[in-house]
Design a protein with these regions (language model features):
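An amphipathic alpha-helix signature
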Residues: 20-29, 69, 73, 77, ...
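Substrate-recognition element of Asp-dependent hydrolases with the DxDx(T/V) motif
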Residues: 90-150, 161-162
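Active-site neighborhood of HAD-like aspartate-dependent phosphohydrolases
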Residues: 1-48
């Protein structure tokens, strides 16, 4: 009997976290060397403040595209107020623009899928005739553009689901009446992939990857007989016969 694989997208099939890191590095450079030199705070202070503000904004703005650049604006305003430095609307506009670098379509195209992803997806579809489902969390507009840019629809067809939050109920809705003993979720986040998949009663392939601070709040990997940890996505192909 064929298997069903429910794949996460960000940092499972395609790189994501480093897009945000790229924007953060440019933000640090702009603040320290262009705007506030020689009165700029320590680099670590700036990044810690930005992460703290961004984590708080998740509670009110969720995973919308606007949250990340808005956090840059708020970080810059906070630093300026603390240092008694004036700022203007042009500064805030620039901070927002830097935050938007995390959503650069050209970078998505350049980076493409993670190493081994295409080979693995081809194998599952062409060789094993398995069913593939894509379940991704985030801003609908951004996720649609990412998936289109990396041409993922050729493997997943219409079985592509984009949700604002991923939990056990969402996974159960996607699984439907399928035999859960034949369903595997594949993802990189303990919080957004491992925990909800195990709670939903399906099997889990965990592929660790660097995640952002909000996801790391719940990073302890649970012990469960339905959980397998691979280091690279290609191991799904190479160790396929062990997935029982």
């Amino acid at each position: 009997m064929n298997k069903t694989f429910i794949f996460d997208y960000d940092d499972t099939l395609a790189w994501n976290q480093h897009d945000y890191s790229y924007a953060q590095l440019e933000f640090l450079r702009w603040i320290i060397f262009e705007k506030l030199w020689p009165n700029a705070p320590d680099l670590q202070y700036i990044i810690n403040l930005e992460v703290e503000i961004d984590n708080k904004n998740v509670e009110t703005m969720g995973f919308s595209m606007e949250r990340f650049p808005t956090s840059f604006q708020q970080t810059y305003k906070s630093i300026c107020k603390e240092k008694n430095i004036n700022y203007n609307e042009e500064d805030l506009k620039k901070a927002y623009e830097i935050g938007m670098l995390a959503f650069d379509k050209k970078r998505w195209k350049k980076l493409g899928l993670v190493e081994g992803a295409k080979e693995t997806l081809d194998y599952l579809v062409e060789k094993e005739k398995d069913e593939l489902i894509l379940l991704t969390k985030g801003d609908l507009k951004i996720q649609e553009k990412k998936i289109k840019t990396t041409d993922c629809q050729k493997w997943f067809g219409k079985e592509i689901y984009m949700v604002p939050q991923k939990d056990a109920s969402v996974i159960n809705n996607v699984v439907g009446n399928r035999d859960k003993s034949r369903v595997w979720h594949v993802g990189n986040s303990v919080r957004s992939d491992v925990s909800p998949a195990l709670e939903a009663g399906i099997k889990m392939i965990y592929i660790p990857c660097e995640t952002w601070a909000y996801e790391r709040k719940h990073e302890e990997v649970p012990k469960n007989p339905r959980l397998i940890t691979f280091q690279k996505i290609i191991e799904i192909k190479n160790k396929y016969n062990s997935l029982i």
